[in-house]
């Protein structure tokens, strides 16, 4: 029997500054596979929903890997499999982010601490 668990904990600086934990971990197990993820949030001030992004990343990895067929490992090269997985995970993550934004738009409250100079500095 395989036993597994995940534990995500908030760092001291986030507690001290009253910030939400931006990291996320999850696991999935069935008779064919065990998938364990650990996703780190973006960590910058401008990433106001980083805690959701890491959750979406974790869920995207699990969803894509659950859909992966064992036979694919015999049909394609390791490089092709990795490139395909990266693309599928990214597409799934983007879809999750877009669905979330459609359900809950970014509010002024979430971005009041940001100004244009700060945004352009971080993206430059």
Identify the residue ranges that each predicted region occupies:
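PP2C/PPM-type serine/threonine phosphatase catalytic domain
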Residues: 1-124
């Amino acid at each position: 029997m395989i036993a597994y668990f995940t534990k995500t904990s908030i760092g001291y600086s986030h507690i001290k500054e009253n910030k939400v934990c931006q990291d996320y971990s999850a696991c999935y197990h069935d008779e064919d596979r065990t998938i364990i993820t650990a996703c780190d949030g973006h960590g910058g001030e401008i990433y106001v929903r980083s805690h959701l992004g890491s959750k979406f990343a974790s869920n995207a990895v699990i969803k894509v890997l659950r859909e992966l067929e064992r036979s694919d490992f015999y049909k394609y090269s390791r490089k092709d499999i990795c490139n395909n997985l990266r693309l599928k995970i990214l597409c799934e993550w983007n879809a999750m982010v877009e669905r979330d934004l459609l359900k809950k738009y970014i509010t002024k409250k979430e971005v009041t601490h940001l100004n244009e100079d700060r945004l352009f500095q971080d993206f430059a």
